């Protein structure tokens, strides 16, 4: 469809980020200045009634526009004006003066300023942009007294990619877009900030990880004072999915642990500290004003956002710090999310996270167990999530990740999940049928959020309709097979009836494959709106006139090769070859000369062109109005869509776990009250998948029923650390409701899992390896209970041998005696085997090895009894230590043993 005309009365455009700008929806439909005066709305409606249009879905491809800047390059390494504050704004050109005014309001953000087909930035932002994104640093004339100022820019059509890179690097971006296409006489184009992008508030699909939540968090701190402990309130929201949760606790370590678990993309705080101890190093801390975090401002923000008369129903008045954090978060959202009219960021009512809802996993344990990323390089492959994730949808992937990061402690809830997994394992046909329905589903959670915020495109709405239409099919498959399931499953089995009506409305209104652009038409089916049909009938008449005109001009000119064509810049024209150009009729007017052809217009063609442009503008405007109405309908049901989406996500996670269990020879663990942890032929869920040429050696473990501490000895590199980790991973898998890699399992619920596996220097904190190891051990001894699972891989290695042995012995005694925590302690201190002679709840186990001459064969088999040797010298030889060094080591060992 032709592009917009150059008519100065053309409809104003709204700023819209990464697609063509959307036309403003006026209150009366079409501005009088743009209406084709020959056809009133009544006449067009009557035309549609007399010539009804039939639905004819068709594919439309959005045009991709590439443009080049005309600014000259400036390769200076030291720009004259490296910061906007160095310049007197009154000496700048009007455009740059406006830029500096906006920059002063957003000094902490990269300001991108729309100029034609580019987003440009100037001064320090231009320097930053050119360095980070490897763009050419150019210059622009800033005024007679200023000269050229630094400039860098990105094409409008590539803005999402470049902004996404800035967001990933931790920057926030303010976008200033054009709010009109033609300025008033003697004035600049109207521009303003239309969107602020920050790591925690983005909604664009290309800037989000599809399979993990993008949390924005806010924290309020009350430091310890006299007899008052350190207290904190935390609010977190995923703007893209609408999930909101709040909590209030004590203890800075608990806050550090919670923030590490959450992994927020952005953390808001009004604390003056630049690097507080309670904030994990990897988090992005955004400093904000303290006013929005005050109690009155926070209450007002909550009442306004949720449209409430009071806050009693939310349960937040009893959590004053969490309430203040939530208010500050909402204020930040309001400042960074300029929304379309009748749109809002659809956030759920805050869910209060209670203490004891989830198994506690500190940051060290998460790293050691490699739940979602490997320790070596932080990649997904090789993690537990990689090994068990068979989900088919993005929302299902996020759901499974949340389950892994916060395993349940409620035995009934765990059993409900496990029963569903068992049903899906046993009923293979049901599982496969559900997975076929799940595979093509879009991300309903985030699509609904974009619709509610007024950012969704036509293709987003079509994807929503497709997903909603699958809900009854999923429910029908589950009917009769689910006896008792979690409450969230009801949103799938008994969905909101309005959702199917909404899907039908989307299908009735939108083409199956609409274009990306919302401003150029081609969105709406024929037969949906009489006024639109009338406009399309008139456009068909104009097309017929153009076809007839081409035939007439061919006859008049005697040129059978003449073509009537259209160009977005030049409009309609008659094209003839160079050879025929001299014989054209006198009433033709030369429009353009090319290498091989000449282009002409006629007065009649020019007059008709204006009428066609007016009709097209009205038709496109009407399509946009109809689309916006439909988008508002979708946004109004965003909460219902998301509830259904959460149920689909949970079902996807369960079917994925069932698929993993069915293909991996897993078993359904017997979940019991108490402290039992009994595993037969248990395997490491990740390592067994990584092995190619060998089979994983399964092993048993029995804790909590007579034995509370296992002292595990054996050679270096024999598999002790793997054994420890597999026990922790199986405990965790059981508490998310999954089957586990074992022949048989009987598992009680753990309140925490602690690991101390390896240690490295923390040079930044001035701590040696030994001090890091002792700090981790102290944390375990302070917080472990008889319901905890403790996995220790060596203690006391970084100091003198007897000091280390003494510490290891005392720690073991405390764990087995005072705490009675279920513990597996892997060590090379063979003296610890004597603990079993002193305490009935301590048992010795070893990893077997087979000696054949100078060679060692690691059997990876765990057996009762303590090892007497570590075979460290043999392990050194296998690692490639030079032979003379190995031989000398044996001589020294013989001397030491003889002296002993």
Swiss-Prot record:
Residues given in the record as ATP binding sites: 714-721
Region called Disordered, residue ranges: 1-88
Matches recorded under SUPFAM superfamilies: DNA repair protein MutS, domain I, DNA repair protein MutS, domain II, DNA repair protein MutS, domain III, P-loop containing nucleoside triphosphate hydrolases
SMART domains: MUTSac (SM00534), MUTSd (SM00533)
Gene Ontology, cellular component aspect: cytosol
Superkingdom of the organism of origin: Bacteria
Matches recorded under InterPro entries: DNA_mismatch_repair_MutS, DNA_mismatch_repair_MutS-lik_N, DNA_mismatch_repair_MutS/MSH, DNA_mismatch_repair_MutS_C, DNA_mismatch_repair_MutS_clamp, DNA_mismatch_repair_MutS_core, DNA_mismatch_repair_MutS_N, DNA_mismatch_repair_MutS_sf
GO molecular function, one term: mismatched DNA binding
CDD domains: ABC_MutS1
Assigned keywords, A-Z: ATP-binding, DNA damage, DNA repair, DNA-binding, Nucleotide-binding
Biased composition (Basic and acidic residues): 56-68
GO biological process: mismatch repair
Function as written in the Swiss-Prot or TrEMBL entry: This protein is involved in the repair of mismatches in DNA. It is possible that it carries out the mismatch recognition step. This protein has a weak ATPase activity.
PANTHER family on file: DNA MISMATCH REPAIR PROTEIN MSH1, MITOCHONDRIAL (PTHR11361:SF34), DNA MISMATCH REPAIR PROTEIN MUTS FAMILY MEMBER (PTHR11361)
Similarity field: Belongs to the DNA mismatch repair MutS family.
Protein's name according to its UniProt entry: DNA mismatch repair protein MutS
């Amino acid at each position: 469809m032709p592009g917009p005309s150059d008519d100065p009365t053309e409809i104003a455009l709204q700023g819209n980020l990464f697609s063509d700008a959307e036309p403003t929806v006026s209150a009366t439909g079409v501005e009088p200045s743009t209406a084709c005066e020959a056809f009133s709305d009544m006449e067009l409606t009557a035309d549609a009634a007399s010539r009804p249009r039939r639905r004819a879905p068709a594919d439309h491809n959005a045009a991709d526009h590439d443009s080049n800047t005309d600014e000259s390059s400036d390769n200076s390494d030291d720009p004259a004006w490296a910061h906007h504050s160095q310049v007197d704004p009154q000496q700048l050109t009007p455009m740059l003066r406006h830029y500096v005014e906006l920059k002063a309001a957003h000094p902490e953000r990269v300001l991108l300023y729309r100029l034609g087909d580019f987003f440009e930035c100037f001064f320090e932002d231009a320097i930053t942009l050119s360095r980070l994104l490897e763009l050419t640093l150019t210059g622009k004339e800033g005024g007679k007294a200023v000269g050229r100022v630094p400039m860098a820019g990105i094409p409008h059509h590539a803005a999402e990619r470049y902004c996404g890179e800035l967001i990933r690097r931790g920057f926030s971006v303010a976008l200033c877009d054009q709010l009109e296409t033609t300025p008033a006489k003697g004035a600049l184009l109207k521009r303003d900030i239309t969107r602020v992008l920050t790591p925690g508030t983005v909604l664009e699909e290309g800037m989000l990880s599809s399979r993990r939540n993008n949390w924005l968090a806010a924290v309020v701190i009350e430091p310890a004072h006299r007899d008052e402990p350190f207290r904190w309130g935390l609010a977190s929201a995923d703007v893209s999915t609408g999930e909101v949760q709040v909590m209030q606790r004590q203890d800075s370590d608990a806050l550090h642990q919670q923030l590490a678990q959450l992994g927020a993309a952005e953390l808001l705080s009004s604390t003056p500290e630049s690097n507080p101890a309670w904030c994990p190093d990897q988090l992005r801390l955004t400093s904000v004003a303290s006013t929005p975090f005050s109690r009155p401002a926070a209450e007002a923000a909550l009442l306004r956002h949720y449209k409430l008369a009071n806050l009693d129903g939310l349960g937040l008045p009893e959590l004053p710090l969490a309430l203040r954090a939530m208010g500050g978060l909402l204020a930040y959202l309001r400042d960074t999310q300029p929304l379309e009219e009748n749109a809002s960021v659809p956030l759920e009512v805050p869910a209060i996270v209670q203490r004891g809802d989830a198994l506690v996993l500190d940051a060290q344990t998460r790293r050691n167990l490699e739940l979602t990323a490997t320790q070596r390089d932080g990649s997904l492959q090789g993690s537990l999530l990689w090994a068990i994730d068979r989900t088919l949808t993005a929302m299902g992937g996020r759901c499974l990740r949340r389950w892994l990061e916060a395993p349940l402690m409620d035995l009934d809830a765990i059993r409900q999940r496990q029963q569903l997994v068992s049903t899906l394992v046993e009923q293979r046909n049901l599982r496969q049928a559900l997975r076929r329905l799940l595979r093509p589903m879009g991300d309903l959670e985030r699509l609904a959020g974009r619709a509610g915020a007024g950012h969704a495109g036509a293709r987003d709405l079509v994807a929503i309709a497709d997903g909603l239409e699958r809900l009854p099919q999923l429910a029908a498959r589950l009917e009769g097979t689910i006896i008792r399931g979690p409450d969230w499953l009801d949103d799938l089995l008994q969905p909101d009836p309005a959702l199917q009506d909404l899907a039908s409305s989307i299908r009735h209104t939108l083409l199956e494959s609409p274009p990306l652009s919302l401003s150029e038409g081609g969105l709406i089916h024929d037969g949906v709106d009489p006024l639109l049909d009338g406009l399309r009938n008139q456009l068909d008449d104009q097309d017929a006139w153009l076809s007839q005109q081409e035939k007439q001009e061919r006859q008049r000119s005697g040129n059978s090769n003449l073509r009537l064509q259209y160009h977005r810049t030049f409009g309609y024209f008659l094209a003839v070859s160079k050879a025929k150009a001299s014989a054209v009729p006198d009433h033709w007017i030369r429009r353009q000369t090319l290498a091989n052809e000449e282009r002409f217009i006629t007065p009649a063609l020019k007059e008709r062109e204006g009428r066609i442009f007016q009709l097209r503008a009205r038709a496109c405007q009407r399509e946009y109005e109809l689309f916006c109405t439909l988008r508002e309908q979708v946004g109004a049901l965003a909460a219902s869509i998301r509830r259904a989406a959460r149920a689909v996500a949970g079902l996807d996670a369960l079917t994925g776990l069932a698929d993993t269990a069915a293909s991996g020879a897993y078993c359904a663990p017997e979940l019991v009250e108490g402290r039992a942890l009994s595993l037969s032929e248990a395997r490491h869920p990740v390592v067994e998948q990584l092995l190619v040429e060998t089979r994983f050696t399964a092993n048993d473990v029995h804790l909590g029923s007579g034995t509370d501490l296992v002292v595990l000895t054996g050679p270096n590199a024999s598999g002790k650390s793997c054994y420890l980790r597999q026990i922790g991973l199986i405990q965790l898998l059981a508490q998310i409701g999954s089957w586990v890699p074992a022949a048989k399992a009987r598992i009680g619920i753990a309140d925490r899992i602690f690991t101390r596996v390896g240690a490295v220097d923390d040079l930044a904190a001035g701590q040696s390896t030994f001090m890091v190891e002792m700090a981790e051990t102290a944390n375990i001894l302070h917080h472990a209970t008889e319901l905890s699972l403790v996995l220790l891989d060596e203690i006391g290695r970084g100091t003198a041998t007897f000091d280390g042995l003494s510490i290891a012995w005392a720690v073991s005694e405390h764990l087995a005696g005072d705490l009675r925590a279920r513990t597996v302690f892997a060590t090379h201190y063979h003296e610890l085997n004597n603990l079993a002679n002193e305490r009935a709840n301590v048992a010795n186990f070893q990893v077997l090895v087979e000696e054949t001459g100078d060679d060692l064969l690691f059997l990876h088999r765990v057996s009762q009894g303590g090892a007497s040797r570590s075979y460290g010298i043999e392990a050194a030889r296998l690692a490639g230590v030079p032979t003379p060094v190995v031989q000398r080591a044996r001589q020294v060992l013989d001397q030491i043993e003889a002296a002993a």
